[in-house]
Amino acid sequence: AVEAARNCLKNSTEVPTSVTLGSTTFPFADRSNSGVVADALNLPLQTQTEDVFGSRRAGTSALVRHFRGSSSTLLLASDCRETRPGSTQEMQYGHGAASLLLGTGDTLADIISVESVHEDLIDQYRTVETKYDYALEERWVREEGWLKIVPETIKSALNKANLEIGHVDKFIVHGTASAARSLLKKLGADSKKLADSLQSNIGDCGCAHPLLMLTNTLAKATTGQHFMVVGFGQGSDVILLKTNDKIAQSKFYQSVDIHLNNKRVVDNYALYLSLRNHIDIDFGLRSERDNRTALSAYYRKRREISAMLGGRCAKCNTLQFPRSLLCVSCGTDEPQEEESLSGLIGRVKSFTEVRYEFGKSKPKAGKR
């Protein structure tokens, strides 16, 4: 989520006044997860934070709720769902995050209509006491859910916008390929208008997936196109958007394609299972450590740790991390101005190689 947010805010002069983070796999049940993200982004302490969870529609539902909002909101959706080794879900699921900056002014696209319907049709679920999702039969979900609940939601959203189904240029549907094709067939729309589902490359990324598909579609959009985003899970969300003339001037930093081109392949299944903590491998004495964080010390140094805040010398302009009482370059004791080093590229001046240091998945050297 932090990585997606940094890509979204890169070269942006607008500072969000609120952060909304949606997920079905939050690491903390009693701690503000969006607050952790806000700290990592070095946002002001007055930034309003909110966690949205409990449904794969968490991302689209948050987008619906912020419709007509006047404040600048950083909307994030991130999921990292666990799967049972050897299961179908292990081959289908992916881990990912997406970020959108919502507000007024210089926008790339305008939300022209939204509709949301709650219907407790359980296509899959996971309780607080279980680790893996339990999914029901796909055909039943398609016929009772996708072909009965979603069409009415879509028609309502189109009526609000005074549009016909033929006006939609791309359908961004988070669902199986058969469900998406069957839905468009029932609506009388061309299945060629389905946006790239991305599932063949990155898998199904849970509540982040519809927003991932949206950002990927926007990166290739032209002026005046109509997009329809469909979220599904115990109901449905439909968002209609129209791109404006700013879309042609936009730059999408770190798009989905760029990340796919920079991927690292893990072709050792045992290593993969170890990275996902599905098997407990003995890594030796060097892997033993205290797993508890010294929270009082972390609180004192949280800005340096989370946002990687360093200091810039007021006298010689040297950027250094961490900040110190004396400048490492000129030795002055003048106050240093806070500056984040996150995202910067530096050169390694010297290093010590420790071949026996523990690491589950050590970084590999290579060209950037």
Segments and roles (model prediction):
Residues 338-368:
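Long, charge-rich boundary regions
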Residues 1-2, 87-144, 148, 222, ...:
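Condensing-enzyme catalytic core mediating Claisen C-C bond formation in acyl metabolism
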Residues 65, 71-99:
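Flexible, glycine-rich active-site loops centered on histidine and acidic residues
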Residues 287-347:
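Cys/His-rich short segments
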Residues 22-28, 54-58, 77-83, 105, ...:
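Acidic, glycine-rich active-site loops and adjacent beta-strand->loop/helix elements
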Residues 24-72, 182-213:
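Conserved catalytic cysteine-centered active-site region
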Residues 1-18, 29, 85, 121-169, ...:
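Conserved active-site "lid/cap" helical segment
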Residues 11-17, 43-48, 70-74, 151, ...:
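Structural signature of cysteine-dependent C-C bond-forming condensing enzymes
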